[in-house]
Amino acid sequence: MSSGGLLLLLGLLTLPAELTPISGQDRPIKPGLCPPRPQKPPCVKECKNDRSCPREQKCCRYGCIYECRDPIFVK
Protein backbone atom coordinates (compact mmCIF):
# COMPACT_ATOMS: atom_id res chain seq x y z
CA MET A 1 0.00 0.00 0.00
CA SER A 2 1.34 3.46 -0.86
CA SER A 3 2.06 6.00 1.86
CA GLY A 4 -0.78 8.19 0.53
CA GLY A 5 -3.24 5.30 0.77
CA LEU A 6 -2.04 4.48 4.27
CA LEU A 7 -2.51 8.09 5.40
CA LEU A 8 -6.01 8.14 3.92
CA LEU A 9 -6.91 4.92 5.74
CA LEU A 10 -5.50 6.25 9.01
CA GLY A 11 -7.46 9.48 8.58
CA LEU A 12 -10.71 7.60 7.97
CA LEU A 13 -10.15 5.41 11.03
CA THR A 14 -9.62 8.41 13.32
CA LEU A 15 -12.57 10.45 11.97
CA PRO A 16 -15.18 9.02 14.42
CA ALA A 17 -12.94 10.01 17.35
CA GLU A 18 -13.07 13.63 16.16
CA LEU A 19 -16.89 13.73 16.09
CA THR A 20 -17.70 14.00 19.80
CA PRO A 21 -21.02 15.51 20.87
CA ILE A 22 -21.19 18.86 22.66
CA SER A 23 -23.32 17.58 25.48
CA GLY A 24 -21.05 15.84 27.97
CA GLN A 25 -17.66 15.74 26.32
CA ASP A 26 -16.65 12.85 28.60
CA ARG A 27 -18.28 9.46 28.20
CA PRO A 28 -20.70 7.85 28.95
CA ILE A 29 -23.24 9.75 26.89
CA LYS A 30 -26.81 9.28 28.06
CA PRO A 31 -29.68 8.73 25.62
CA GLY A 32 -32.02 11.52 24.55
CA LEU A 33 -31.66 15.17 23.55
CA CYS A 34 -31.52 18.38 25.56
CA PRO A 35 -34.80 20.33 25.83
CA PRO A 36 -35.06 23.99 24.69
CA ARG A 37 -32.92 26.63 26.40
CA PRO A 38 -34.11 27.67 29.88
CA GLN A 39 -34.58 31.28 30.99
CA LYS A 40 -31.68 31.74 33.43
CA PRO A 41 -28.98 34.30 34.15
CA PRO A 42 -25.97 34.09 31.79
CA CYS A 43 -23.05 31.75 32.37
CA VAL A 44 -24.43 29.41 35.05
CA LYS A 45 -22.38 26.19 35.26
CA GLU A 46 -24.26 23.53 37.22
CA CYS A 47 -22.42 20.61 35.59
CA LYS A 48 -19.35 19.68 33.57
CA ASN A 49 -20.59 16.57 31.72
CA ASP A 50 -23.35 13.92 31.80
CA ARG A 51 -21.58 12.05 34.61
CA SER A 52 -21.92 15.05 36.91
CA CYS A 53 -25.73 14.95 36.61
CA PRO A 54 -28.02 12.74 38.72
CA ARG A 55 -30.05 9.80 37.44
CA GLU A 56 -30.82 9.98 33.70
CA GLN A 57 -30.30 13.75 33.45
CA LYS A 58 -27.93 15.18 30.84
CA CYS A 59 -25.49 18.07 31.16
CA CYS A 60 -26.96 20.47 28.60
CA ARG A 61 -25.12 23.45 27.15
CA TYR A 62 -26.95 26.60 26.12
CA GLY A 63 -24.26 29.12 25.19
CA CYS A 64 -22.25 29.55 28.39
CA ILE A 65 -24.99 27.95 30.56
CA TYR A 66 -24.39 24.32 31.61
CA GLU A 67 -27.16 22.65 33.58
CA CYS A 68 -28.57 19.21 34.37
CA ARG A 69 -31.86 18.65 32.53
CA ASP A 70 -34.19 15.74 31.94
CA PRO A 71 -33.66 14.49 28.37
CA ILE A 72 -36.29 14.63 25.67
CA PHE A 73 -36.72 11.86 23.12
CA VAL A 74 -37.59 12.44 19.46
CA LYS A 75 -39.09 9.71 17.28
UniProtKB/Swiss-Prot annotation:
Expression by tissue, per the entry, reads: Expressed by the venom gland.
Per the record's keyword annotation, is Metal-binding included, yes or no? no
Q: Which BP terms from GO are recorded?
A: antibacterial humoral response; innate immune response; venom-mediated disruption of cell wall in another organism
Annotated WAP domain residues:
27-72
Q: Which InterPro entries match?
A: Elafin-like_sf, WAP_dom, WAP_four-disulfide_core
> Which cellular components does GO assign to this protein?
extracellular region; extracellular space
Q: Name one Pfam family in it.
A: WAP
Where found?
Answer: Secreted
**Secreted recorded as keyword:** yes
Role description: Damages membranes of susceptible bacteria. Has no hemolytic activity. Not toxic to mice. Does not inhibit the proteinases elastase and cathepsin G.
**Family statement:** Belongs to the venom waprin family.
Protein's name in the database = Nigwaprin-b
- Species: Cryptophis nigrescens (Eastern small-eyed snake)
Lineage of producing organism: Eukaryota, Metazoa, Chordata, Craniata, Vertebrata
